[in-house]
From Swiss-Prot:
Belongs to the bacterial ribosomal protein bL34 family. This is Large ribosomal subunit protein bL34. One of its GO terms (molecular function) is structural constituent of ribosome. GO terms for cellular component: ribonucleoprotein complex; ribosome. GO terms for biological process: translation. Keywords: Ribonucleoprotein, Ribosomal protein. It comes from the Bacteria. Pfam families: Ribosomal_L34 (PF00468). It comes from Bifidobacterium animalis subsp. lactis (strain AD011).
Length: 44
């Protein structure tokens, strides 16, 4: 059986990269939450 997670860096950045997050209000809120929490990595 084929596994569900097939890693692909291009898809990863197109779907959950920083620039994509900044496009929507919800995405910007997510980045701000992660900043407030002190995450080392904010997005893919």
């Amino acid at each position: 059986m084929k596994r569900t997670f097939q890693p692909n860096n291009r898809r990863r950045h197109m779907k959950s990269g920083f620039r994509v997050r900044m496009r929507t209000r919800a995405g910007r809120a997510l980045i701000n939450r992660r900043r407030a929490k002190g995450r080392k990595s904010l997005s893919a």
